Amino acid sequence: YCIGKRIFGQMPLRCTFNPIAGRESRFPNGKVGKAEEKKRVAIIGAGPAGLEAAYIAAQRGHSVEVYEATDRLCGGQLRIASSSPCKDILQHIPDFFRVQLGRLPNVKIHLNSPVTAENAASIEADTVLVCTGAEPLVPNIPGIDGANVKKAQDVLLGKAEVKGDVVICGGGQVGVETALELIERGHKITIVEMLPDLILKEELMTRIVMMKKLAAAGVNILCSHSVT
């Protein structure tokens, strides 16, 4: 992202996890100013967005409580992404936030604490930030509920058993990363993609490496095709 999307795209430097990167002139010494009014801030979701929001809010002097449904920091989309063999470096992100937030006495993190319609009213806060991430888009295809149909996130996390040859519907970043994982497990892969080519939104150098790996593994690629 920082190189392929920003620098090669002749855009200002930005970082996926450090919002101050490229904006240092606005934040002397990398710190934000203190808030004039201290508030109680509740953050729902302990992914990168929620934890960064907690860090900034606490630096400004607010009292922060973070509620996470899973048993770990970054237990949602980042955990799924970091399970890919080409993105295992992302597994260090939760440790970074754990250290940073551990230095701030005005941050409390509640794991295994999903916020629901039933218990939301019990949260006492002046401000609530919803940082709950996203769910995968499941297309309305006949047979999509079949026992042999698995979600990419379940495959990457080892929650879904995969047998035999595999057809992957979608040749974007998630589809190709899942294909690379299944190749390492010894599966024969076919990727079906609606667009004229795979991972068109991926930055150039990463795309070249991933496409070479698919070619070396003999993956069957069907572009400009739809699953119906």
What is the predicted function of each stretch?
Residues 63-103, 180-225:
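Rossmann-like dinucleotide-binding cores of NAD(P)H-dependent redox enzymes
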Residues 23-26, 73-78, 138-139:
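Short acidic/His/Gly/Ser-rich catalytic and metal-binding motifs that mark active-site loops
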Residues 15, 101, 129, 149:
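Conserved hydrophobic/aromatic pocket- or pore-lining residues that grip, position, or stack substrates
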Residues 35-72, 109-124, 131-141, 145-148, ...:
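Rossmann-like dinucleotide/flavin-binding elements
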Residues 4, 17, 80, 86, ...:
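Generic structural "secondary-structure junction" signal
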Residues 1-37:
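Cysteine-cluster motifs in flexible loop/terminal segments that predominantly coordinate metals
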